[in-house]
């Protein structure tokens, strides 16, 4: 009897072991669909000049969850609102860290910032400070006089062009506006007397965006890719940009110590005060390098994104005269006669907000959210996503998903009428600021900049296309790089709106 019982238990154990082994083998095989690649480089050759568009096209064949091999790095790309929800909400804690990337590492003084640092206690404490101190609604509202002053200068500049009948480069105007507002709010000073004038600073920021969006071999071949970066000159370009930014930060610190500034407490004032108070972040005290890394996030995140959105919005409005007429009528009928629209006025401009949402849907400033790194294995659409997988959310593709959006290629702000979808991170159909733990903490600051700048340009001026062009000549080509900016600058002729 004992022998029979022993043999029965042994047989049952063998069956259970075989079933467990088979299940583990099945799990190992449950990888997302993957396009064929080449040895060593994997799928790098399929990225193209505009990776978000290339991967969108691949997702049509291989699905909304797609596995690729970029060099030696296993990478998963998700391209639908449902899979984005699983990544950013349901499995957020499994994959909310960041991969090690050469450009961000150099700019952030070895990951002392909030955008690119890995998920740990240091990051949690830093985010708390940023949310409660730097980007709170109260602090952002304290910068409103700066926005009003700079938008007034923009209105005066465009008015002068209107009186002369000369075209205006709106791409440049919007970039200059966001540079001035961001720098005044961050540093409390203009460029006069600093190591950088406005033009040089804008070029430095442009070059920084360029190398962040450039192919860096060390990001895909950690063991030897740095050699390629040296040979291509990318490493040198990166080092020069970092040194130039560092010199600028140091001069800003000196100006603040001398008290050579005016206005409300800016970001540098706040951070220097926290340094003086010996604020502890993570395992150490706040240092100058911490402050520089945070300032880098403010500059890189604040300057390009708002200008890009305003430029794309004006581009789409010029291509869609019906929408232009409707949004200008709303603004002018609601506001009446004023020298400038205020933030309180903007709360009444519902169609303008729809125009901005529709712009974010078709033209998210960052077509991919900053890549994540998987910290613990999880399942996504029944596929196993292993530890150390690099994960991208293709926001650009989500905005064009026909399963979510009817006629996705049409610019149609009315699709947001009676819709609960907004850009605040709770609706995964629209993710210009991301969602989850790594959502952009400066969302309110960015949104108000776009609303305020765009509303005043639409209120004060009518716009026409330069002589010899038609609406269809205004193209939608995107520039390669970190952000999906308009490749060809938007140049329009302003006409002063006289009824105020």
From Swiss-Prot:
Its cofactor is heme. Pfam families: p450. GO terms for molecular function: heme binding; iron ion binding; monooxygenase activity; oxidoreductase activity, acting on paired donors, with incorporation or reduction of molecular oxygen. It is an enzyme of class 1 (oxidoreductase). Keywords: Heme, Iron, Membrane, Metal-binding, Monooxygenase, Oxidoreductase, Transmembrane, Transmembrane helix. The keyword Nucleotidyltransferase does not apply. It comes from the Eukaryota. Heme binds at residue 440. The chain crosses the membrane at residues 1-21. This is Cytochrome P450 71B36. It comes from Arabidopsis thaliana (Mouse-ear cress). The gene is CYP71B36.
């Amino acid at each position: 009897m004992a022998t029979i019982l022993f043999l029965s238990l042994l047989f049952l154990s063998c069956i259970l072991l075989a079933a467990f082994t088979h299940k583990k083998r099945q799990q190992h095989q449950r990888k997302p669909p993957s396009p064929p690649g080449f040895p060593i480089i994997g799928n790098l050759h399929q990225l193209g000049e505009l990776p978000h568009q290339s991967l969108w096209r691949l997702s049509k064949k291989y699905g909304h969850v797609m596995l690729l091999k970029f060099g030696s790095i296993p990478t998963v790309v998700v391209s639908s609102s449902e899979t984005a929800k699983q990544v950013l909400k349901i499995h957020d804690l499994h994959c909310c860290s960041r991969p090690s990337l050469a450009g961000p590492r150099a700019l952030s003084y070895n990951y002392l910032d909030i955008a690119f640092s890995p998920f740990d206690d240091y990051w949690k404490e830093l985010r708390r400070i940023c949310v409660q101190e730097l980007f709170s609604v109260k602090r952002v509202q304290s910068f409103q006089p700066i926005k009003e002053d700079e938008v007034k200068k923009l209105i005066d500049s465009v008015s002068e062009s209107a009186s002369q009948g000369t075209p205006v480069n709106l791409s440049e105007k919007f970039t200059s506006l966001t540079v001035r507002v961001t720098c005044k709010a961050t540093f409390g000073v203009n460029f006069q007397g600093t190591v950088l004038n406005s033009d040089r600073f804008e070029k430095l920021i442009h070059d920084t965006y360029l190398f962040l969006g450039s192919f860096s071999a060390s990001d895909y071949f950690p063991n030897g890719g740095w050699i390629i970066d040296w040979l291509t000159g990318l490493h040198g370009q990166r080092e020069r940009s970092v040194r130039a930014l560092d010199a600028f930060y140091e001069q800003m610190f000196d100006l603040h110590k001398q008290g050579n500034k005016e206005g409300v407490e800016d970001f540098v004032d706040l951070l220097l005060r926290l340094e003086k108070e010996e604020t502890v972040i993570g395992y150490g005290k706040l240092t100058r390098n911490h402050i520089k890394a945070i300032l880098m996030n403010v500059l890189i995140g604040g300057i390009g994104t708002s200008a890009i959105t305003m430029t794309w919005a004006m581009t789409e409005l010029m291509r869609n005269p019906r929408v232009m007429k409707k949004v200008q009528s709303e603004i002018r009928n609601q506001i009446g006669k004023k020298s400038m629209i205020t933030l309180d006025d903007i709360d009444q401009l519902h169609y303008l907000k729809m125009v901005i949402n529709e712009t974010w849907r078709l033209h998210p400033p960052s077509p991919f959210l900053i890549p994540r790194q998987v910290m613990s294995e999880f399942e996504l659409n029944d596929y196993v996503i292993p530890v150390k997988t690099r994960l991208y959310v293709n926001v650009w593709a989500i905005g064009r998903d026909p399963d979510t959006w009817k006629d996705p290629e049409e610019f149609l702000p009315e699709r947001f009428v009676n819709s609960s979808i907004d850009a605040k991170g709770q609706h995964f159909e629209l993710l210009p600021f991301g969602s989850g733990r790594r959502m952009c903490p400066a969302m309110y600051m960015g949104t108000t900049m776009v609303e305020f700048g765009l509303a005043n340009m639409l209120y004060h001026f009518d716009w026409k296309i330069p002589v010899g062009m038609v609406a269809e000549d205004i193209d939608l080509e995107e520039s390669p790089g970190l952000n999906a900016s308009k490749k060809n600058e938007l140049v329009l002729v302003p006409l002063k709106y006289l009824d105020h």
